[in-house]
Amino acid sequence: MAKSKFERTKPHVNIGTIGHVDHGKTSLTAAITKYFGEFKAYDQIDAAPEERARGITISTAHVEYETEKRHYAHVDCPGHADYVKNMITGAAQMDGAILVVSAADGPMPQTREHILLARQVGVPAIVVFLNKVDQVDDAELLELVELEIRELLSKYDFPGDDIPIVKGSALAALEDKDKSIGEDAVRLLMSEVDNYIPTPERPIDQPFLLPIEDVFSISGRGTVVTGRVERGVIKVGEEIEIIGIRPTSKTTVTGVEMFRKLLDQGQAGDNIGALLRGVDREGIERGQVLAKPGSVTPHTRFKAEAYILTKDEGGRHTPFFTNYRPQFYFRTTDVTGIVTLPEGIEMVMPGDNVAMDVSLIVPIAMEEKLRFAIREGGRTVGAGIVSKIIE
């Protein structure tokens, strides 16, 4: 069968189901595909393939579907550890999340942890599906559970009072039972997702940024840097800043090449060579970035959320403590940093996820939500995301 062309007519949004184990994330995912996509049964989604992101193996199921308004790519993970890894590494980017909570149990430890992670990694918006409502006869009890969910969301700085909560039963939807809590609830959920989760700004519309991968000089022409444009557009003749590792400097892009052809501009996703005016080959290096002036700044100290690999995943065999000094791999280069653990946390074991403060020995062009790998001698031992810049 011929592969159908990916229709680019609708806005595209990346989404995922989050929540406590056995609250119905995978059943809900299956139910959504039943009405909005090519139906995928529970077992097809649950048998998620393994993939590698930043040196870490993660099991993630990807499904796609569309509403009248949008096209969605949806991720669902089989295990709690996979969620933690997925959210921290950004293996599957999430523009929004559907938090699934069982009405019979209410919020549980992983409900809390996934909300906290969503906050730390910058998931912009959450919509709630209160599942298994057919297991609760008492309307007052349902109200209490809803209140509890709203309070929990507010506690982690989501607008708990405004977040849509849809009540239903994923199982009823899958089994074509009680339509009001089955099919109708799933359709209502997707209309809330359509309206409440904002359409992300496309990379091409964001300010220009290119992480430098390589630098060389061309006799008679000057210095060329190569790399993949991460976001935005660069036109010949535009002024840019060179940021990170050394003091920030300004230059002008005098040429853009792709596949040995000269272009007027390079844009998000393009692998380009950029010719820079008046820059010495020695004055620029891999690990710096080219960026639109004023759009991003260099920093050395930040708070991060990180996942530390287990021994079986190829990570450390032993715990680490405050003053641990690994390399932090940002975009294209390793920078040594010193770790400070939060008060009350003595050590971090392989397999833990942890909040920590990091102080780099040289500044890197940085913003919140920037992801990194933690490495020791070129071997990945963890992954993290900048949750807050300190200085």
From Swiss-Prot:
Gene: tuf2
Organism from which the protein derives: Bartonella quintana (strain Toulouse)
Keyword annotations of the record: Cytoplasm, Elongation factor, GTP-binding, Hydrolase, Magnesium, Metal-binding, Nucleotide-binding, Protein biosynthesis
Region: G4, residue numbers: 131-134
Domain tr-type G residues, every copy: 10-201
Subunit structure comment from the entry: Monomer.
Protein name: Elongation factor Tu 2
GO molecular function: GTP binding; GTPase activity; guanosine tetraphosphate binding; translation elongation factor activity
Start and end residues of each stretch annotated as G3: 76-79
Residue span of region G2: 55-59
Entry's Gene Ontology cellular component terms: cytosol
Predominant location category: cytoplasm
InterPro entries, sorted: EF-Tu_GTP-bd, EF-Tu_GTPase, EFTu-like_2, EFTU_2, G_TR_CS, P-loop_NTPase, Small_GTP-bd, T_Tr_GTP-bd_dom
